[in-house]
């Protein structure tokens, strides 16, 4: 359980050597470079230094990255190759990668341009097709109208098209408009579920009377004068244009399908651009004079030899020192063994420890392991979870946080198997149900300890005992931190007295089984603890009244401890839920009895129920195990707030550069 010791690094080097040096620094991947805001804003430095202006380079590279990303998206839609569940990065020697990029860069950039342009052409044509289909839909009601649409008026007459609700009485409407405008000719062209479509021909001087007469009928005028020919002719013309666009899209898609063969090279170009962009950003974080550049940074103490070797190779001035004890800007890096490291994901989701804090990962790991397994608590589910995670780790070799999470679930599967065997849970009671349904025999896998469904109160006691131990460990960590920081009295008064009180209460209440003496000892411990808390709980407050009220307030905190212990009853709830849900599915699967139909039903229901139960209850176990760490456990000693160490390194998506050879990628 270690927070890695950090060193502060200051470097001054020649501008002429900056580019190759930055390549090598990225290759090492162990130095975090500060933004150097303090230096650039220091009045003493300001006349002589400036920040390298490379925002244009960064913007250009980001535009190139976006373009390559679009190309990958375009050809990805036509890549029929089966994609792995967890894609792995291709491993390449840095020198080989540099040579490869030199040989494929020009061709790959042309392929990117072709993919992007083709993809855009497809998008534009699909937009045009949608527009044309919209026009066709608008013309559909008028396809029986044999009047050219552009001829909406003559010297003396006009054609008014429009629509009214489908419930409109055409005969009555015709009578009304002809009464207002005697010259009107009315034609009901078509109708659909919502509207009727009409064409009105009248003298120009009667247009206002026509529209006024149509107002009570919720008439909506339609203008199609921008169309050429009849509606049928225009629709046919648009359909031809759609066919032409669809043909061009098919040709474009064939181009993209051929470019799939170059996908790997385009991925290489993407990562190359990402590295160039990151190097350009780092240059922007440095400050310079006409001849030299300067930066501050952080590195793990264990990386000092290789960083010093690089700086000496370039003959740069540098200074490496321990950070100021009060400097809160120091980044945090955790280092644990292979068993504990997977559980760093749990710590990281809450907050990293401060630089002076204890890394809680090694302490929470065994409890998380136990709690997760107790909540899922089915031996068969545990074997499935562990086996599945082991296969993923071996076959797909995920990296980073994904690797840690899957490995953690693999360990938690072992815990699930252990608790399941202790409680007798093997796919719930599947084997018992199957034996009785198909063979008429009783078959029960006996628990190695006890059956929680038969003895739920016993499981509740186990849950609360584990919770109390969990809380006591958290309190012990706080006591250790107090002693380490030179506050032994705080450890005694704030933790030791609570140990006395809480343990005393437990002995007083339940110590009868240990003998009458245990009850008496518990009573004395509880009284001493309570009086001690009352007298010392307000020791940091001023005045007798303040100290007394502070002591009473501290003693009232016993209700908080009771609440915290009761929170661990969720171990009981989720532990029972897994078994109950499994038994429900097993019972449903056996309703058809024996025979072929019964066998099929049982297999289908069993398979679905198993997947459902593992998914739902594993998620619940994950969430609630985290909750017990974050709220109950961390609440006793942990504040967090550490800033994660973010080294300047290759952040690639498709390739993994090995730390060998020379890096000459431009």
PLM feature spans:
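Conserved, carboxylate-rich catalytic/transport cores that coordinate ions
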Residues: 2-7, 19-22, 26-33, 305-666
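Long, charged N-terminal accessory/stalk domains
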Residues: 1-364, 392, 399-402, 406
């Amino acid at each position: 359980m270690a927070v890695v010791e950090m060193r502060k690094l200051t470097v001054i080097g020649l501008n002429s050597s900056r580019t190759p040096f930055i390549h090598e620094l990225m290759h090492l991947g162990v130095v975090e470079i500060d933004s150097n805001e303090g230096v650039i804003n220091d009045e003493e430095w300001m006349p002589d230094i400036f920040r390298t202006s490379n925002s244009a380079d960064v913007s250009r590279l980001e535009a190139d990255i976006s373009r390559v990303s679009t190309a990958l998206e375009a050809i990805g839609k036509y890549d029929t190759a089966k994609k792995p569940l967890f894609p792995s990065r291709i491993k390449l020697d840095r020198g080989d990668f540099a040579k490869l990029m030199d040989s494929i860069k020009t061709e790959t950039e042309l392929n990117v341009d072709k993919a992007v342009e083709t993809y855009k052409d497809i998008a534009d044509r699909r937009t045009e097709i949608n527009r044309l289909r919209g026009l066709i839909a608008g013309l559909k009601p008028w396809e029986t109208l044999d009047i050219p649409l552009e001829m909406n008026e003559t010297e003396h007459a006009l054609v008014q098209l429009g629509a009214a609700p489908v419930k409109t009485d055409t005969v009555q409407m015709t009578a009304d408009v002809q009464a207002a405008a005697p010259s009107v000719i009315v034609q009901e062209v078509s109708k659909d579920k919502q509207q009727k479509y009409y064409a009105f021909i009248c003298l120009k001087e009667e247009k206002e009377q026509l529209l006024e007469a149509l107002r009570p009928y919720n008439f909506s005028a339609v203008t199609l004068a921008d169309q050429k020919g009849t509606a049928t002719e225009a629709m046919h013309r648009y359909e031809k244009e759609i066919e032409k666009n669809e043909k061009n899209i098919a040709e474009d898609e064939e181009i993209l399908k051929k470019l799939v063969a170059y996908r790997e090279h385009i991925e290489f170009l993407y990562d190359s651009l990402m590295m160039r962009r990151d190097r350009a950003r780092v240059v922007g974080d440095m400050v310079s004079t006409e001849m030299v550049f300067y930066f501050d940074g952080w590195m793990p103490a264990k990386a000092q030899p290789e960083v010093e070797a690089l700086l000496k190779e370039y003959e740069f001035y540098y200074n490496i020192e321990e950070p100021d004890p009060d400097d809160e800007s120091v980044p945090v890096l955790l280092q644990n063994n292979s068993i504990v490291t997977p559980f760093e994901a749990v710590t990281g989701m809450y907050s990293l420890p401060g630089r002076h804090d204890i890394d809680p990962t090694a302490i929470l790991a065994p409890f998380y392991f136990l709690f997760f397994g107790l909540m899922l608590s089915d031996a068969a589910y545990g074997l499935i979870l562990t086996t599945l995670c082991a296969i993923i780790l071996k076959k797909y070799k995920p990296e980073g946080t994904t690797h840690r999470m899957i490995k953690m679930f693999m360990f938690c599967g072992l815990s699930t198997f252990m608790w399941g065997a202790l409680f007798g849970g093997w796919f719930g009671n599947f084997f018992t149900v199957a034996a009785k349904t198909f063979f008429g025999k009783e078959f029960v896998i006996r628990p190695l300890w006890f059956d929680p469904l038969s003895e739920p109160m016993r499981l509740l006691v186990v849950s609360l005992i584990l919770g109390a131990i969990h809380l006591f460990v958290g309190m012990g960590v706080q006591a250790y931190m107090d002693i380490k920081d030179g506050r032994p009295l705080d450890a005694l008064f704030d933790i030791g007295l609570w140990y006395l009180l809480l343990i005393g209460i437990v002995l007083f209440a339940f110590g009868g089984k240990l003998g009458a003496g245990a009850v008496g000892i518990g009573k004395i411990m509880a009284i001493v603890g309570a009086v001690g808390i009352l007298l010392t709980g307000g020791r940091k407050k001023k005045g007798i009244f303040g100290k007394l009220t502070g002591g009473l307030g501290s003693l009232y905190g016993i209700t908080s401890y009771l609440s915290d212990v009761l929170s661990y009853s969720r171990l009981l709830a989720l532990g029972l839920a897994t078994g109950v849900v499994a038994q429900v599915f097993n019972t449903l699967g056996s309703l058809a009895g024996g025979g072929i139909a019964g066998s099929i039903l049982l297999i289908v229901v069993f398979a679905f129920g198993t997947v459902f139960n593992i998914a739902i209850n594993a998620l619940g176990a994950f969430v609630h195990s985290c909750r017990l760490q974050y709220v109950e456990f961390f609440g006793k000693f942990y504040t967090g707030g550490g800033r994660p160490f973010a080294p300047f390194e290759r952040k690639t998506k498709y390739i993994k550069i090995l730390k060998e050879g020379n890096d000459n990628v431009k």
